[in-house]
């Protein structure tokens, strides 16, 4: 295969594609197309109904008009802030919340014990799977490695294409339990073969929470503090679910509506989540903040920090995209409740990790970025930090490598994907097929 020849042809054809595939923005306005399935205010086009979660970002004013309000996130009728607040000091919430999202009701004590036991039993991979699938084809792109593993797991399942509800529930539970292993083992394989680091495979232990197992499998000595495990558990809870309209969950429902199997639906969702506009934003926040540290000597100098942020917005700094990563959200306007919850734990972790200077810098950017954006952009709703703003800092303080940031997101979000797959299977009667209007010119 002559790659230079193929690359040269592709480069030549790029301009042809741009010429023939560019559609005038005016046509989208003419035909009333909501690009990205969202209106000018960022509100999504209504495409379905769900009982799994609810996002609140607007409320009715005195005149009946919708006005922005502090953001709220509800799981199966329960406010996420309440779910986290109700946890005991040494109690983990991932498993309890997963049960709630999957089955629509809080588990009793006996139901939770049974569910935790099922997850423990499912925390294993087929014989030699780690060696034959994960270790033999390592990749720096851990999301690709996990996606490949998910599709390969179908080969070990005699009922892989059976999309009946009972079988799909079983498959979803197994994948939820296996995702931490797929993520961590894929990273270790890459780190060994690409970075020439030591290779070690720690097995998950029964009785440990998902957060505890993740940290133990990742670290050479398997050690972690109670606060580290608690903060990671909270982060996982906050990332589990975010409505049916987010890109990866909608992808799950689209693929499910076609009658496809669980493994294919989850692999498709993974392909969506790995996109930098969806699951990769927290990495960009960390990179942006690292760049800021290099260009601003005094991390408490708010004037210098704001000047740097203005340079970013003018495309004169960082990646020259004009974006301050971690600011704003497609749905929330006044506040992102997930960011508020995570923020309440960040300061404690920063003290434990002796990273208080980093935390102060983040707080300054959190306060100054909305001001800078308001001064340079025409905005249709408020701008506030989203969950990605602090999640990257949390993972950095937990010594989780950047290659695992998005896979960790997936480890949580697969619970939401599974819940929506189940709901789609129960209520499915039509394949999802939105309309596209052709503006092609006929050539005789």
Feature locations, PLM:
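Non-transmembrane, aqueous-exposed alpha-helical and coiled segments at domain scale
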Residues: 1-444
